[in-house]
Amino acid sequence: MSRSAEEVEATLQIAKVDLEDLRNTVHCLTFSSDFTSGDYSLMELDDTLCKQIEAGDSLVIRGDKSDHAVLCSQDKTYDLKIADTSNLLLFIPGCKTPDQLPADQQPLTIINCEIAGFSNHYWELRRCRPKLKKLKKLLMENTYNGPENERESQDNSLHTTEDLLNMIQASNEELVDHLKAIHACSINGFWRLLDFDYEMKLLNHITQLIDSESWSFSKVPLPVCLQELRSLEPEEMIEHCLTCYGKRLIDEGTGGDFFALDEDKICRATALMLLQNAVKFNLAEFQEVWQQSVPEGMNTRLDQLKGLALVDRTSRPETIFLLKTEDLPEDTQERFNTLFGMREKWAEADIAPYIKDLCGEKQTIGALLTKYARSSMQNGIKLYNSRRPLS
Protein backbone atom coordinates (compact mmCIF):
# COMPACT_ATOMS: atom_id res chain seq x y z
CA MET A 1 0.00 0.00 0.00
CA SER A 2 1.48 3.34 -1.08
CA ARG A 3 1.05 6.61 0.80
CA SER A 4 0.53 10.14 -0.41
CA ALA A 5 2.67 13.12 0.59
CA GLU A 6 -0.22 14.42 2.71
CA GLU A 7 -0.42 11.13 4.65
CA VAL A 8 3.32 11.22 5.29
CA GLU A 9 3.19 14.80 6.59
CA ALA A 10 0.21 13.93 8.82
CA THR A 11 2.13 10.99 10.29
CA LEU A 12 5.12 13.23 11.00
CA GLN A 13 2.90 15.73 12.79
CA ILE A 14 1.46 12.98 15.00
CA ALA A 15 5.02 11.84 15.76
CA LYS A 16 5.98 15.49 16.45
CA VAL A 17 8.80 15.35 13.92
CA ASP A 18 9.59 18.51 11.95
CA LEU A 19 9.83 17.83 8.20
CA GLU A 20 12.59 20.45 7.92
CA ASP A 21 14.84 18.25 10.08
CA LEU A 22 14.62 15.40 7.57
CA ARG A 23 15.63 14.79 3.98
CA ASN A 24 12.81 15.26 1.50
CA THR A 25 12.82 11.58 0.48
CA VAL A 26 10.53 9.09 2.20
CA HIS A 27 10.64 5.31 1.80
CA CYS A 28 7.21 3.74 2.00
CA LEU A 29 7.70 0.09 3.00
CA THR A 30 5.38 -2.83 2.23
CA PHE A 31 5.89 -6.56 2.48
CA SER A 32 6.49 -8.40 -0.79
CA SER A 33 3.60 -10.60 -1.97
CA ASP A 34 5.86 -13.68 -1.96
CA PHE A 35 7.57 -12.74 1.32
CA THR A 36 8.39 -15.58 3.72
CA SER A 37 10.61 -15.41 6.79
CA GLY A 38 13.89 -17.33 6.81
CA ASP A 39 14.56 -16.97 3.08
CA TYR A 40 17.75 -14.98 3.61
CA SER A 41 20.84 -15.09 5.80
CA LEU A 42 23.17 -12.20 6.53
CA MET A 43 26.94 -12.48 6.74
CA GLU A 44 29.33 -9.82 8.00
CA LEU A 45 32.38 -9.49 5.74
CA ASP A 46 35.59 -7.54 6.21
CA ASP A 47 36.95 -5.28 3.46
CA THR A 48 39.16 -8.01 2.02
CA LEU A 49 36.32 -10.51 1.62
CA CYS A 50 34.02 -7.81 0.23
CA LYS A 51 36.54 -6.98 -2.48
CA GLN A 52 36.94 -10.68 -3.31
CA ILE A 53 33.17 -11.09 -3.70
CA GLU A 54 32.93 -7.94 -5.83
CA ALA A 55 35.74 -9.28 -8.01
CA GLY A 56 33.73 -12.44 -8.67
CA ASP A 57 35.56 -14.80 -6.31
CA SER A 58 33.66 -17.45 -4.38
CA LEU A 59 33.33 -18.14 -0.66
CA VAL A 60 32.68 -21.77 0.25
CA ILE A 61 31.18 -23.24 3.43
CA ARG A 62 32.88 -26.55 4.26
CA GLY A 63 32.30 -29.30 6.78
CA ASP A 64 30.63 -32.68 7.31
CA LYS A 65 27.42 -33.06 9.32
CA SER A 66 29.42 -33.66 12.49
CA ASP A 67 31.75 -30.67 11.92
CA HIS A 68 31.33 -27.08 12.99
CA ALA A 69 30.96 -25.26 9.66
CA VAL A 70 33.74 -23.00 8.42
CA LEU A 71 33.83 -20.53 5.55
CA CYS A 72 36.79 -20.55 3.16
CA SER A 73 38.07 -17.95 0.75
CA GLN A 74 40.84 -18.78 -1.71
CA ASP A 75 43.53 -18.42 0.97
CA LYS A 76 41.94 -18.22 4.44
CA THR A 77 39.55 -20.12 6.72
CA TYR A 78 36.96 -18.50 8.98
CA ASP A 79 34.91 -19.81 11.88
CA LEU A 80 31.16 -19.18 11.47
CA LYS A 81 29.24 -17.97 14.50
CA ILE A 82 25.66 -16.66 14.78
CA ALA A 83 25.38 -13.19 16.33
CA ASP A 84 21.96 -11.94 17.45
CA THR A 85 20.83 -8.34 16.97
CA SER A 86 18.51 -6.32 19.21
CA ASN A 87 16.83 -4.74 16.17
CA LEU A 88 15.09 -6.48 13.29
CA LEU A 89 17.14 -6.19 10.10
CA LEU A 90 15.07 -5.65 6.93
CA PHE A 91 16.17 -6.60 3.40
CA ILE A 92 14.91 -3.84 1.10
CA PRO A 93 16.00 -3.94 -2.56
CA GLY A 94 15.89 -0.45 -4.04
CA CYS A 95 16.26 1.34 -0.72
CA LYS A 96 18.56 4.34 -1.06
CA THR A 97 21.07 5.43 1.56
CA PRO A 98 21.59 9.15 2.40
CA ASP A 99 24.74 9.37 0.29
CA GLN A 100 22.72 8.24 -2.75
CA LEU A 101 20.17 11.07 -2.39
CA PRO A 102 20.56 14.69 -3.55
CA ALA A 103 21.06 17.09 -0.65
CA ASP A 104 18.63 19.74 -1.95
CA GLN A 105 15.85 17.52 -3.25
CA GLN A 106 12.48 19.34 -3.52
CA PRO A 107 9.60 18.77 -3.02
CA LEU A 108 8.78 15.75 -0.79
CA THR A 109 9.51 12.55 -2.75
CA ILE A 110 8.09 9.13 -1.91
CA ILE A 111 9.90 5.91 -2.88
CA ASN A 112 7.79 2.77 -2.61
CA CYS A 113 9.87 -0.25 -1.56
CA GLU A 114 9.03 -3.87 -0.85
CA ILE A 115 10.51 -5.74 2.11
CA ALA A 116 11.98 -8.95 0.68
CA GLY A 117 12.96 -10.48 4.01
CA PHE A 118 14.18 -9.87 7.53
CA SER A 119 16.50 -11.32 10.14
CA ASN A 120 17.34 -10.80 13.78
CA HIS A 121 20.77 -12.42 13.51
CA TYR A 122 23.73 -12.66 11.15
CA TRP A 123 26.77 -14.83 10.57
CA GLU A 124 29.90 -13.44 12.16
CA LEU A 125 33.28 -14.49 10.74
CA ARG A 126 36.42 -15.02 12.77
CA ARG A 127 39.72 -16.09 11.25
CA CYS A 128 40.65 -19.60 12.38
CA ARG A 129 43.22 -22.28 11.67
CA PRO A 130 42.39 -24.72 8.88
CA LYS A 131 41.40 -28.16 10.16
CA LEU A 132 44.01 -30.32 8.48
CA LYS A 133 44.46 -33.27 10.84
CA LYS A 134 42.24 -35.52 8.71
CA LEU A 135 44.33 -34.86 5.59
CA LYS A 136 47.30 -37.06 6.41
CA LYS A 137 45.03 -39.85 7.63
CA LEU A 138 43.23 -39.86 4.27
CA LEU A 139 46.48 -39.96 2.31
CA MET A 140 47.95 -42.68 4.53
CA GLU A 141 45.24 -45.05 3.26
CA ASN A 142 47.20 -45.48 0.04
CA THR A 143 50.85 -44.47 0.22
CA TYR A 144 53.19 -44.61 -2.76
CA ASN A 145 55.98 -47.17 -2.47
CA GLY A 146 57.48 -47.06 -5.93
CA PRO A 147 56.12 -48.01 -9.37
CA GLU A 148 56.77 -51.72 -8.91
CA ASN A 149 54.51 -51.84 -5.84
CA GLU A 150 51.49 -50.03 -7.30
CA ARG A 151 48.20 -51.93 -7.08
CA GLU A 152 46.10 -52.16 -10.23
CA SER A 153 42.74 -51.12 -8.74
CA GLN A 154 43.05 -48.30 -6.25
CA ASP A 155 41.10 -45.29 -7.57
CA ASN A 156 38.61 -45.41 -4.68
CA SER A 157 41.32 -44.46 -2.19
CA LEU A 158 43.00 -41.80 -4.34
CA HIS A 159 42.18 -38.11 -4.04
CA THR A 160 42.45 -35.09 -6.33
CA THR A 161 42.69 -31.52 -5.02
CA GLU A 162 38.94 -31.12 -5.57
CA ASP A 163 38.22 -34.34 -3.64
CA LEU A 164 40.28 -33.13 -0.70
CA LEU A 165 38.64 -29.69 -0.68
CA ASN A 166 35.29 -31.47 -0.31
CA MET A 167 36.56 -33.35 2.74
CA ILE A 168 39.00 -30.98 4.46
CA GLN A 169 37.99 -27.71 6.16
CA ALA A 170 40.63 -25.49 4.62
CA SER A 171 41.05 -22.97 1.83
CA ASN A 172 42.65 -24.02 -1.44
CA GLU A 173 45.97 -22.30 -0.67
CA GLU A 174 46.11 -23.62 2.91
CA LEU A 175 45.42 -27.15 1.67
CA VAL A 176 48.09 -27.07 -1.03
CA ASP A 177 50.63 -25.49 1.35
CA HIS A 178 50.03 -28.28 3.87
CA LEU A 179 50.27 -30.96 1.19
CA LYS A 180 53.73 -29.62 0.37
CA ALA A 181 54.65 -29.45 4.07
CA ILE A 182 53.86 -33.15 4.59
CA HIS A 183 55.79 -34.04 1.38
CA ALA A 184 52.71 -35.13 -0.58
CA CYS A 185 53.27 -35.62 -4.30
CA SER A 186 50.87 -35.25 -7.22
CA ILE A 187 51.01 -38.50 -9.23
CA ASN A 188 48.73 -38.78 -12.28
CA GLY A 189 46.55 -36.00 -10.86
CA PHE A 190 46.14 -37.65 -7.44
CA TRP A 191 47.80 -36.53 -4.21
CA ARG A 192 49.91 -39.28 -2.65
CA LEU A 193 52.10 -39.58 0.41
CA LEU A 194 55.31 -41.46 -0.14
CA ASP A 195 55.84 -44.41 2.16
CA PHE A 196 58.42 -43.13 4.65
CA ASP A 197 60.83 -46.01 4.02
CA TYR A 198 60.59 -45.35 0.28
CA GLU A 199 61.19 -41.63 0.83
CA MET A 200 64.30 -42.42 2.86
CA LYS A 201 65.43 -44.82 0.13
CA LEU A 202 65.21 -41.98 -2.41
CA LEU A 203 67.10 -39.65 -0.08
CA ASN A 204 69.78 -42.29 0.45
CA HIS A 205 70.27 -42.65 -3.32
CA ILE A 206 70.76 -38.89 -3.58
CA THR A 207 73.20 -38.56 -0.67
CA GLN A 208 75.24 -41.55 -1.87
CA LEU A 209 75.51 -39.97 -5.33
CA ILE A 210 76.59 -36.67 -3.75
CA ASP A 211 79.30 -38.51 -1.83
CA SER A 212 80.54 -40.47 -4.86
CA GLU A 213 80.65 -37.33 -7.04
CA SER A 214 82.15 -35.18 -4.24
CA TRP A 215 79.44 -32.56 -4.74
CA SER A 216 78.67 -29.88 -2.21
CA PHE A 217 75.35 -30.31 -0.39
CA SER A 218 74.66 -26.71 -1.36
CA LYS A 219 75.01 -27.38 -5.09
CA VAL A 220 73.49 -30.61 -6.39
CA PRO A 221 73.02 -30.36 -10.19
CA LEU A 222 69.52 -31.53 -11.09
CA PRO A 223 70.11 -32.79 -14.67
CA VAL A 224 73.13 -34.91 -13.69
CA CYS A 225 71.36 -36.22 -10.60
CA LEU A 226 68.34 -37.32 -12.64
CA GLN A 227 70.52 -38.89 -15.32
CA GLU A 228 72.58 -40.89 -12.81
CA LEU A 229 69.62 -42.15 -10.76
CA ARG A 230 66.95 -42.72 -13.43
CA SER A 231 67.89 -46.40 -13.65
CA LEU A 232 67.06 -46.80 -9.95
CA GLU A 233 63.92 -44.69 -9.48
CA PRO A 234 61.53 -42.56 -11.60
CA GLU A 235 62.94 -39.11 -12.34
CA GLU A 236 59.85 -37.36 -10.93
CA MET A 237 60.38 -39.15 -7.59
CA ILE A 238 64.03 -38.10 -7.42
CA GLU A 239 63.08 -34.50 -8.20
CA HIS A 240 60.25 -34.62 -5.64
CA CYS A 241 62.67 -35.83 -2.96
CA LEU A 242 65.11 -33.03 -3.82
CA THR A 243 62.24 -30.53 -3.55
CA CYS A 244 61.25 -31.89 -0.12
CA TYR A 245 64.77 -31.74 1.31
CA GLY A 246 66.26 -28.81 -0.54
CA LYS A 247 65.72 -25.55 -2.36
CA ARG A 248 65.76 -25.23 -6.15
CA LEU A 249 68.12 -22.55 -7.46
CA ILE A 250 69.46 -21.41 -10.84
CA ASP A 251 73.17 -21.49 -11.68
CA GLU A 252 73.98 -17.96 -12.86
CA GLY A 253 76.83 -19.25 -15.00
CA THR A 254 75.17 -22.15 -16.85
CA GLY A 255 71.50 -21.31 -16.28
CA GLY A 256 70.95 -24.90 -15.13
CA ASP A 257 68.86 -25.97 -12.13
CA PHE A 258 70.52 -27.17 -8.95
CA PHE A 259 69.40 -27.89 -5.39
CA ALA A 260 70.82 -26.71 -2.08
CA LEU A 261 70.02 -29.47 0.41
CA ASP A 262 68.73 -28.50 3.86
CA GLU A 263 70.88 -30.03 6.60
CA ASP A 264 68.22 -29.59 9.27
CA LYS A 265 65.54 -31.38 7.21
CA ILE A 266 67.80 -34.33 6.44
CA CYS A 267 68.96 -34.67 10.05
CA ARG A 268 65.34 -34.46 11.22
CA ALA A 269 64.19 -37.18 8.80
CA THR A 270 67.06 -39.42 9.91
CA ALA A 271 66.06 -38.94 13.56
CA LEU A 272 62.46 -39.87 12.71
CA MET A 273 63.70 -43.06 11.06
CA LEU A 274 65.62 -43.99 14.23
CA LEU A 275 62.92 -43.04 16.74
CA GLN A 276 59.76 -44.32 15.04
CA ASN A 277 60.16 -47.91 16.23
CA ALA A 278 61.46 -47.20 19.75
CA VAL A 279 59.35 -46.31 22.80
CA LYS A 280 62.27 -44.48 24.41
CA PHE A 281 65.89 -44.09 23.47
CA ASN A 282 68.87 -43.47 25.75
CA LEU A 283 69.69 -39.86 24.82
CA ALA A 284 73.47 -40.23 24.72
CA GLU A 285 73.26 -43.42 22.64
CA PHE A 286 70.70 -41.85 20.32
CA GLN A 287 72.86 -38.79 19.67
CA GLU A 288 75.81 -41.02 18.82
CA VAL A 289 73.83 -43.26 16.44
CA TRP A 290 72.06 -40.25 14.93
CA GLN A 291 75.33 -38.49 14.07
CA GLN A 292 76.69 -41.69 12.54
CA SER A 293 73.54 -42.12 10.43
CA VAL A 294 73.46 -38.73 8.69
CA PRO A 295 75.56 -38.04 5.57
CA GLU A 296 79.20 -37.25 6.28
CA GLY A 297 79.68 -33.51 6.63
CA MET A 298 76.32 -32.87 8.27
CA ASN A 299 75.99 -32.07 11.97
CA THR A 300 73.10 -33.13 14.19
CA ARG A 301 71.66 -30.89 16.92
CA LEU A 302 68.76 -31.47 19.29
CA ASP A 303 67.11 -28.19 18.25
CA GLN A 304 66.54 -29.80 14.83
CA LEU A 305 63.93 -32.02 16.51
CA LYS A 306 61.51 -29.35 17.73
CA GLY A 307 57.95 -30.60 17.46
CA LEU A 308 59.20 -34.09 16.56
CA ALA A 309 60.85 -35.53 19.68
CA LEU A 310 60.97 -34.72 23.38
CA VAL A 311 63.90 -35.10 25.75
CA ASP A 312 63.27 -36.27 29.32
CA ARG A 313 65.98 -34.68 31.46
CA THR A 314 64.50 -36.05 34.71
CA SER A 315 65.03 -39.72 33.89
CA ARG A 316 68.32 -41.48 34.61
CA PRO A 317 69.83 -41.92 32.13
CA GLU A 318 68.28 -39.09 30.12
CA THR A 319 65.99 -40.32 27.35
CA ILE A 320 64.40 -39.11 24.13
CA PHE A 321 61.16 -40.28 22.52
CA LEU A 322 59.04 -39.50 19.48
CA LEU A 323 56.32 -36.88 20.01
CA LYS A 324 55.03 -35.29 16.81
CA THR A 325 52.94 -32.12 16.84
CA GLU A 326 50.74 -33.54 14.08
CA ASP A 327 49.67 -36.39 16.39
CA LEU A 328 48.29 -34.01 19.05
CA PRO A 329 44.66 -32.75 19.13
CA GLU A 330 43.77 -29.74 16.95
CA ASP A 331 41.56 -28.17 19.64
CA THR A 332 43.58 -25.80 21.83
CA GLN A 333 42.22 -26.92 25.21
CA GLU A 334 42.49 -30.59 24.28
CA ARG A 335 46.08 -30.01 23.13
CA PHE A 336 47.04 -28.48 26.49
CA ASN A 337 45.20 -31.26 28.37
CA THR A 338 47.16 -33.88 26.43
CA LEU A 339 50.50 -32.17 27.00
CA PHE A 340 49.93 -31.61 30.72
CA GLY A 341 48.72 -35.20 30.97
CA MET A 342 52.11 -36.33 29.68
CA ARG A 343 54.15 -33.99 31.83
CA GLU A 344 52.85 -32.00 34.80
CA LYS A 345 55.23 -29.05 34.33
CA TRP A 346 56.84 -27.74 31.17
CA ALA A 347 59.58 -25.24 30.45
CA GLU A 348 58.56 -22.81 27.71
CA ALA A 349 61.38 -24.02 25.44
CA ASP A 350 59.99 -27.58 25.62
CA ILE A 351 56.29 -26.83 25.17
CA ALA A 352 56.60 -24.00 22.61
CA PRO A 353 57.15 -26.26 19.55
CA TYR A 354 53.96 -28.16 20.43
CA ILE A 355 51.68 -25.12 20.70
CA LYS A 356 53.21 -22.73 18.16
CA ASP A 357 50.72 -23.76 15.47
CA LEU A 358 47.81 -22.90 17.81
CA CYS A 359 48.64 -19.19 17.87
CA GLY A 360 46.14 -17.03 16.02
CA GLU A 361 46.89 -13.86 14.11
CA LYS A 362 49.04 -11.52 16.21
CA GLN A 363 48.93 -13.99 19.14
CA THR A 364 52.18 -14.97 20.84
CA ILE A 365 53.15 -18.21 22.55
CA GLY A 366 53.42 -16.23 25.81
CA ALA A 367 49.82 -15.02 25.48
CA LEU A 368 48.64 -18.57 24.79
CA LEU A 369 50.45 -19.89 27.87
CA THR A 370 49.01 -17.10 30.03
CA LYS A 371 45.50 -18.13 28.97
CA TYR A 372 45.81 -21.90 29.34
CA ALA A 373 48.58 -22.41 31.92
CA ARG A 374 49.90 -21.19 35.26
CA SER A 375 53.56 -20.32 35.76
CA SER A 376 55.85 -20.96 38.70
CA MET A 377 59.58 -20.73 39.36
CA GLN A 378 61.62 -23.83 40.11
CA ASN A 379 65.40 -23.62 40.55
CA GLY A 380 65.37 -20.31 38.70
CA ILE A 381 63.46 -21.75 35.70
CA LYS A 382 59.92 -20.68 34.83
CA LEU A 383 57.67 -23.73 34.48
CA TYR A 384 54.06 -24.01 33.30
CA ASN A 385 51.33 -26.31 34.55
CA SER A 386 47.64 -26.67 33.69
CA ARG A 387 45.12 -24.01 34.74
CA ARG A 388 42.42 -26.67 34.84
CA PRO A 389 42.36 -29.82 36.97
CA LEU A 390 43.01 -32.83 34.74
CA SER A 391 40.63 -35.75 35.00
Curated annotation (Swiss-Prot):
InterPro entries referenced in this protein's UniProt entry, alphabetically:
Dcc1
Localized where?
Nucleus
UniProt-listed Pfam families: Dcc1
UniProt keyword annotations, A-Z? Cell cycle, DNA replication, DNA-binding, Nucleus
Just give the chief location class: nucleus
Would you identify the family this protein belongs to, as annotated? Belongs to the DCC1 family.
Protein's name in the database: Sister chromatid cohesion protein DCC1
Tell me the organism.
Xenopus tropicalis (Western clawed frog)
| Lineage, opening ranks | Eukaryota, Metazoa, Chordata, Craniata, Vertebrata
The encoding gene: dscc1
